[in-house]
Design a protein with these regions (language model features):
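C-terminal catalytic domain of Rieske-type non-heme iron oxygenases
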Residues: 2-161
Length: 161
């Protein structure tokens, strides 16, 4: 079932060498609520800005897919020159999609201070340059952030009807 995802997005994940990555931390959160409401809240367009204000230190407040700014275009062009795919891509049914986003405020990683979470090590063949965040979604239940120094994976799973 993952072949279409791998075929379309493998060029995004390959430079990160995720198959060789180690799990540094794992958390399980059980929300005692109607899972449909939890899901809808999570996918709400303004969820991150309202629920996670600390993300605004490094993550763009709006990644709506609107026309990129000149700075964003330069960032994408530089990433492509480094052999790192940047263009927004998606499946025909929008089940999965990926894009590379430029981090804000000079951040190099999605951490509280914007500095790399893992110092002195890069994932796969990531260069020392700021490679931004590859944001990968597989709807409806999985989203991931791949950064130069670490990757984050989130999965939602209803436990009851």
């Amino acid at each position: 079932p993952f072949a279409p995802v791998r075929e379309m997005l493998g060029h995004y994940s390959e430079p990160f060498g995720l198959a060789d990555a180690r799990i540094a931390h794992q958390t399980r959160v059980v929300e005692r609520a109607n899972w449909k409401l939890v899901w809808e809240n999570n996918r709400e367009c303004y969820h991150c800005v309202a629920a996670h204000p600390e993300l605004r230190r490094s993550f763009p407040a709006s990644s709506s897919g609107s026309l990129p700014t000149d700075e964003e275009l330069r960032f994408s062009e530089k990433a492509e020159q480094l052999g790192l795919p940047s263009a927004f891509t998606r499946s025909d049914d929008f089940q999965f999609r990926a894009t590379r986003l430029q981090l804000v405020n000079g951040a190099q990683s999605m951490t509280m201070d914007g500095r790399p979470a893992v110092r002195g090590e890069r994932l796969g063949r990531m260069p020392e340059e700021n490679v931004g965040d590859v944001l990968f979604y597989h709807y409806p239940s999985t989203w991931q952030h791949w950064l130069g120094d670490h990757a984050l994976t989130f999965r939602t799973l209803p436990l009851s009807p």
